[in-house]
């Protein structure tokens, strides 16, 4: 693995262990050229996934982008990074095991909503407000009412 700091192609693995959900291998690496340490993750990729957006545009599935959008919804909420990683891993596994190589972006959004609903209700509403394109306060009220909560 090439060092991200100096570009040296000869780095050493100092520690290797599975992640909490065993979906990846976490490796601590050391670069003897610049004495830097960095972490890498090794994951199984069953197939290359392509996301089909609303306008028909296609792009490669990006798990980092998915994690970023979930982190934004969870910002300043009592949600730890491991919980976010579990949601991302679960979504990626479901998409890969679906048998389809092209996935509609709407399906990904619904999976994120499903994951956030069980994790944090505020993060769930935040994500829904962007995903479902809420335009006014009434949209929030209507959505919260479907959750069984009161908008008052």
Swiss-Prot record:
Molecular function via GO: ATP binding; DNA binding; zinc ion binding
Superkingdom field: Bacteria
The keyword Lipid metabolism is annotated on this UniProt entry: no
Annotated Basic and acidic residues bias: 12-21
Residue ranges covered by zinc fingers (unnamed): 3-34
Gene Ontology biological process terms in this record: negative regulation of DNA-templated transcription
Keywords, comma-separated and alphabetical: ATP-binding, DNA-binding, Metal-binding, Nucleotide-binding, Repressor, Transcription, Transcription regulation, Zinc, Zinc-finger
Positions of the ATP-cone domain: 49-139
Keyword hit for Chaperone: no
Region (Disordered): 1-21
Cofactor(s), names only, from the UniProt record: Zn(2+)
Family membership: Belongs to the NrdR family.
HAMAP family from the UniProt entry: NrdR (MF_00440)
Cited function: Negatively regulates transcription of bacterial ribonucleotide reductase nrd genes and operons by binding to NrdR-boxes.
Protein name: Transcriptional repressor NrdR
Lineage, opening ranks: Bacteria, Pseudomonadati, Pseudomonadota, Alphaproteobacteria, Rhodospirillales
């Amino acid at each position: 693995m090439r060092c991200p700091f100096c570009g040296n192609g000869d780095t050493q693995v100092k520690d290797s262990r599975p992640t909490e959900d065993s979906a990846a291998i976490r490796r601590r690496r050391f670069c003897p050229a610049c004495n830097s340490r960095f972490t890498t993750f090794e994951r199984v990729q069953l197939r290359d996934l392509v996301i089909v957006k609303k306008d028909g545009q296609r792009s490669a599935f990006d798990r980092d982008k998915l994690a970023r959008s979930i982190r934004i919804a969870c910002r300043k909420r009592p949600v730890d990074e491991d919980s976010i990683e579990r949601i991302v891993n679960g979504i990626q596994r479901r998409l890969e095991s679906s048998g389809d190589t092209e996935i509609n972006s709407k399906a990904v959004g619904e999976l994120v909503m499903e994951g956030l609903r069980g994790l944090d209700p505020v993060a769930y509403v935040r994500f829904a407000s962007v995903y479902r394109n809420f335009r006014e306060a009434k949209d929030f009220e209507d959505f919260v009412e479907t959750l069984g909560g009161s908008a008052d």
